[in-house]
């Protein structure tokens, strides 16, 4: 069930990475940049956990596909970082739009929020990629080790 080749192991590693990373980073952003109280941010993060659980593994597979293309283009580390940013922004932005539509935001609010989120995502996408790689090593995901070799 949790063999190194297990899809479940891969899904658990990706889910762990997304829930932990998004909870910590977004809480810091909400409190220190957005001016939310600790309680407001905690509520926001608790609501976000189910969404993160649902999108973590699909995002991991999407990122892996983009990384394969990037690796074929160039082995340079800047290409990997650019691919991480591209994967993060192109996957997370539509998810964010859907969340904002669900909570009743208008198009003006959505445009402002998503634009800001894209800028932050451009800074955080590569960092999340490194954290995801670390979690996959921590969980001993074998396909990850084979892809890196």
UniProtKB/Swiss-Prot annotation:
Belongs to the AlaE exporter family. It is found in: Cell inner membrane. The keyword Magnesium does not apply. One of its GO terms (cellular component) is plasma membrane. Keywords: Amino-acid transport, Cell inner membrane, Cell membrane, Membrane, Transmembrane, Transmembrane helix, Transport. It comes from the Bacteria. One of its GO terms (biological process) is amino acid export across plasma membrane. One of its GO terms (molecular function) is L-amino acid efflux transmembrane transporter activity. Pfam families: AlaE. This is L-alanine exporter AlaE. The keyword Iron does not apply. Exports L-alanine. The chain crosses the membrane at residues 16-36, 46-66, 85-105, 112-132. It comes from Citrobacter koseri (strain ATCC BAA-895 / CDC 4225-83 / SGSC4696). The lineage of its organism: Bacteria, Pseudomonadati, Pseudomonadota, Gammaproteobacteria, Enterobacterales. It is a multi-pass membrane protein.
């Amino acid at each position: 069930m949790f063999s190194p080749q297990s899809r479940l192991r891969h899904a658990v590693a990706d889910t762990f990475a997304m829930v932990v990373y998004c909870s910590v980073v977004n809480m810091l952003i909400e409190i220190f940049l957005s001016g939310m109280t600790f309680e407001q941010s905690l509520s926001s993060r608790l609501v976000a956990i189910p969404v993160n659980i649902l999108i973590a593994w699909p995002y991991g597979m999407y990122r892996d596909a983009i990384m394969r293309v990037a690796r074929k283009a160039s082995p340079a580390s800047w290409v990997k970082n650019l691919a991480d940013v591209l994967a993060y922004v192109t996957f997370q932005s539509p998810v964010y739009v859907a969340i904002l539509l669900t909570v009743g935001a208008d198009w003006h609010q959505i445009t402002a929020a998503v634009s800001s989120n894209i800028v932050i995502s451009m800074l955080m996408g590569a960092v999340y990629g490194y954290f995801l790689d670390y979690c996959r090593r921590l969980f001993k995901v074998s396909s990850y080790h084979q892809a890196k070799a």
